[in-house]
Amino acid sequence: MRIPLPSPRSAAGLLPLLGCLLTGCSAAAPVPAPDETIKAATRALTDACLMRQGLTPPHPGESPPPTDEQQITAALFGKGPTELSLTLPTGYVVRAHTDGCLGAAQQRLYGDQRRWFRVSVIVNNLEAEASHTHRPLSEVRDRHRADLADWHRMRTRALSEATTVLNQPPFQGDMPR
């Protein structure tokens, strides 16, 4: 059998053929981005937590049945007074619960939910702080160098934990370490 080759003008068309011949046509599986890996592990942990409570996790883009919505929201995000609070330089106050399935997932992945809450809120609002204080973003980033270092360290830990969670058999990723 004869394989038609591209004309010399389209030599670029030979690169995929050459690559296929050299590698045996096996393509490496794409590596998901760190954000996607952490997001998938968070989802696996929160879904398992909800299921342990007898609740059906909502699917992305779908709302739970109205009768279950309050129960699922409370189980997922926590209830009662918020335990975590941070006032930003803009005056905006960010609050979160430490209880709930999301809090448990963050504790598992980041190792210190309170610290993660603080540094992630700060890092996610650096541009708003720069705008509010009329300072260059580089100056604001420099002022928060320690927070940025903590954020990177905790994200690295979360990626490692997320990989572990996703490589475990179903419903074991929620076990404490």
Regions found by a protein language model. Give the residues of each.
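Mitochondrial intermembrane space
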Residues: 2-11, 19-20, 25-177
